[in-house]
């Protein structure tokens, strides 16, 4: 009898080792040593062994990269270290690199004759940012960036990506979070779309959208069939691992652990060298096997990075230097009017589809009637389309060719195309707005979606399709009516089974406990963004004081000017708006209130720094943060010697351990409430 038959455990271990090695050679190093057929043979042999001996099947086996069960949904993941974005240099010429170098030297107060700084230069991948969490070298979680603080758990799909190692080499650190980009190579994208066309399915518009959609698939077996790639470029939470002193050294160290790192990275000295890197990559951009939308520069030395620090949550030591947006010409087939959440009527160009900036564009914004007139655009013209900011397509002008027939200028409608209400233009404004308010179905839909958003009332499961059914079916006409929805009414809608309906009802109930800032933001008041809502909540402390404040009192709030103050006053002067607010409160929507800064009373937590970890019994994290900040305290994302209190709930993680190690006071929700009293 052979050794293989005598010791299946040893053979299975050998096969796993071989498969991991060859997968790394193929997917990471792009230097395979065996043909595909041989890799498939080894894979099949391991599958057979594990089927015959189920006890040999391990979570990190190459055969377990597909998780067949369809998940109910993606759960939220709170990032231990926020996934912050970096600043974008708006000067897309090589001189943008010189501006960054000058800004860094100025921030470091370097004299003109000081030696040039060393920078790490790399590509800016056009994909989806991902955080990989390894514990003792084993992949335990993958999460999207989300809003920077909270992302989505996508371990089930990211685990199918062959270039993402499930086990790192030679590392036993308790925690190592690796950050990078998931993307789809152009040849993989073309092959995927070809398969979609052959199957009569919808094709993807660009590799980035394909990658994002695949990562967020609930069924991991679908992700397995749609190949993605990954490049590492940074770190998140790190415990028990010595981080190299330079960024270039970090990337080399990550590569040594078995993580894929792009080969185009380099280290240069001075701004001129950065500009040369920008120009060089631009020249070969179209020949790259994947899409990029720029390059990234980072000060190489970590000590200098720490010295430079952050500005408005963006590192001073890094910048994304983009390339000019791509432009194409196409025919303007027509103009339609889109009605926004606040009633704004926006002319939208209906275009002959054109591929521009990596996307097939058939609609583009025309902004307003004045822009239409200024650019001299009329239906039937050949126009120039650009993806503004590589995201929002816009018509930037017309190709100056003679028209063969008279075409009149486009005129904005005098009535809303959705509800027929009068369209009005405020004095001093270029925009026409529907006067129908929530009578207008288009505004109702957008108002409901805004109200339910993650940073507003956070009603999970209330998306576009469902809102469309609720409004078009006459089920919902006002915001408070959301809280009267029951399972019986929901199950009658398309794609709403008993479980989905019950989940939405539960989400509606959970959303009733909120914060004043979130509630103000959710109302969709013109000019009131998230930051202004927080400032109002902090200043006044109670909704009634906000609603009753005069323009003069509103102007006392940080960053509130005459336009914002008048917008607030106008909103709350409308009886129907106050009625909506009262109906929402009657439905059970509530939040904690306080005396507010306006009273100039001493605040009990002034000067104190808190860190939140785990799940609190009755307070959501945002609600707790709001209360602490309203009482004068500060909420930080990580524990340090400067932390005064760590508020720990159920399933508190590494922050609790670090607090205990540093001797920082650890309290629960009850103790926090006692401090607030």
Swiss-Prot record:
Catalytic-site annotation from UniProt: 124
Top-rank EC class of the record's enzyme: ligase
GO biological process, one term: DNA replication
GO MF terms held by the record: DNA binding; DNA ligase (NAD+) activity; metal ion binding
InterPro entries named among the record's database cross-references: BRCT_dom, BRCT_dom_sf, DisA/LigA_HHH, DNA_ligase, DNA_ligase_AS, DNA_ligase_CS, DNAligase_adenylation, DNAligase_N
Residues that, per the record, bind NAD(+): 36-40, 85-86, 122, 145, 181, 298, 322
Pfam families from the UniProt entry: BRCT, DNA_ligase_aden, DNA_ligase_OB, DNA_ligase_ZBD, HHH_2, HHH_5, Nlig-Ia
Transmembrane segments: none
Binding site for Zn(2+): 416, 419, 434, 440
Cofactors (names): Mg(2+); Mn(2+)
PROSITE patterns: BRCT, DNA_LIGASE_N1, DNA_LIGASE_N2
GO cellular component: cytosol
Reactions performed catalytically: NAD(+) + (deoxyribonucleotide)n-3'-hydroxyl + 5'-phospho-(deoxyribonucleotide)m = (deoxyribonucleotide)n+m + AMP + beta-nicotinamide D-nucleotide
UniProt keyword Plastid present: no
Alphabetical UniProt keywords: DNA damage, DNA repair, DNA replication, Ligase, Magnesium, Manganese, Metal-binding, NAD, Zinc
EC number: 6.5.1.2
Residue intervals of the BRCT domain: 600-677
Family to which the UniProt record says this protein belongs: Belongs to the NAD-dependent DNA ligase family. LigA subfamily.
Function recorded in the entry: DNA ligase that catalyzes the formation of phosphodiester linkages between 5'-phosphoryl and 3'-hydroxyl groups in double-stranded DNA using NAD as a coenzyme and as the energy source for the reaction. It is essential for DNA replication and repair of damaged DNA.
Protein name stated in the entry: DNA ligase
Lineage: Bacteria, Pseudomonadati, Pseudomonadota, Betaproteobacteria, Burkholderiales
Gene that encodes the chain: ligA
């Amino acid at each position: 009898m052979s050794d293989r038959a005598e010791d299946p455990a040893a053979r299975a271990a050998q096969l796993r080792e071989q498969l991991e090695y060859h997968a790394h050679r193929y997917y990471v190093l792009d230097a395979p040593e065996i043909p595909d057929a041989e890799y498939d043979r080894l894979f099949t042999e391991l599958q057979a062994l594990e089927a015959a001996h189920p006890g040999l099947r391990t979570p990190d086996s190459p055969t377990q990269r597909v998780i067949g069960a369809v998940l109910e949904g993606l759960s939220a993941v709170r990032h231990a270290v926020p996934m912050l974005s970096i600043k974008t240099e708006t000067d897309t010429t090589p001189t943008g690199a010189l501006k960054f170098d000058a800004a860094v030297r100025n921030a470091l107060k370097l004299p003109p004759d000081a030696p040039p700084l060393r920078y790490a230069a790399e590509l800016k991948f056009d994909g989806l940012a991902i955080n990989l969490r390894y514990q003792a070298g084993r992949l335990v979680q993958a999460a999207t960036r989300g809003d920077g603080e909270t992302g989505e758990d996508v371990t089930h799909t990211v685990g199918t990506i062959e270039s993402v190692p499930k086990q790192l080499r030679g590392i036993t650190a308790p925690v190592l979070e690796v950050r990078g980009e998931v993307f789809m190579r152009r040849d993989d994208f073309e092959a995927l779309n070809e398969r979609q066309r052959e199957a009569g399915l919808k094709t993807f518009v660009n590799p980035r959208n394909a990658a994002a959609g695949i990562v967020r698939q609930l069924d991991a077996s679908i992700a397995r069939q749609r190949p993605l790639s990954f490049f590492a470029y940074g770190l998140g939470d790190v415990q028990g691992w010595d981080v190299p002193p330079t960024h270039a050294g970090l990337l080399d160290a990550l590569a040594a652990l078995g993580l894929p790192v792009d080969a185009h990275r380099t280290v240069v000295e001075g701004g001129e060298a950065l500009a040369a890197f920008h120009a060089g990559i631009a020249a070969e951009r179209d020949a790259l096997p994947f899409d990029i939308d720029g390059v990234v520069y980072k000060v190489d030395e970590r000590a200098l990075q720490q010295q430079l620090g952050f500005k408005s949550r963006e590192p001073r030591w890094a910048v994304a230097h983009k390339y000019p947006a791509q432009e194409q010409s196409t025919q303007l087939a027509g103009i339609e009017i889109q009605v926004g959440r606040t009633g704004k009527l926006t002319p939208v160009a209906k275009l002959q589809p054109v591929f521009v900036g990596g996307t097939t564009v058939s609609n583009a914004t025309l902004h307003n009637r004045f822009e239409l007139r200024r650019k001299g655009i009329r239906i039937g013209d050949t126009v120039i389309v650009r993806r503004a900011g590589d995201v929002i397509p816009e018509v930037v002008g017309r190709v100056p060719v003679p028209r063969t027939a008279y075409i009149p200028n486009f005129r904005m409608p005098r009535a809303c195309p959705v509800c027929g209400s009068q369209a009005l233009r405020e004095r001093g404004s270029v925009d026409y707005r529907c006067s129908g308010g929530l009578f207008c179905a288009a505004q109702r839909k957008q108002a409901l979606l805004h109200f339910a958003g993650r940073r507003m009332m956070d009603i999970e499961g209330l998306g576009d399709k469902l809102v469309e059914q609720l409004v078009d079916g006459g089920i919902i006409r006002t915001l408070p009516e959301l809280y009267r929805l029951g399972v019986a009414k929901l199950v009658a809608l398309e794609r709403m089974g008993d479980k989905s309906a019950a989940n939405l009802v539960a989400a509606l109930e959970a959303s009733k406990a909120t914060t004043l800032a979130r509630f103000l933001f959710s109302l969709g008041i013109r000019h009131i963004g998230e930051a202004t809502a927080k400032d109002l909540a902090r200043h006044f402390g109670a909704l009634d004081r906000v609603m009753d404040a005069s323009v003069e009192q509103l102007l006392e709030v940080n960053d509130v000017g005459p336009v914002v103050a008048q917008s607030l006053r106008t909103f709350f002067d409308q009886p129907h708006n106050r009625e909506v607010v009262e109906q929402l409160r009657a439905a059970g929507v509530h939040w904690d209130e306080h005396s507010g800064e306006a009273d100039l009373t001493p605040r009990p937590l002034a000067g104190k720094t808190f860190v939140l970890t785990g799940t609190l019994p009755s307070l959501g994290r945002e609600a707790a943060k709001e209360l602490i900040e309203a009482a004068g305290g500060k909420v930080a994302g990580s524990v340090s010697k400067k932390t005064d209190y760590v508020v720990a709930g159920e399933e508190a993680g590494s922050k609790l351990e670090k607090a205990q190690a540093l001797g920082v006071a650890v309290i629960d929700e009850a103790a926090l409430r006692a401090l607030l009293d």
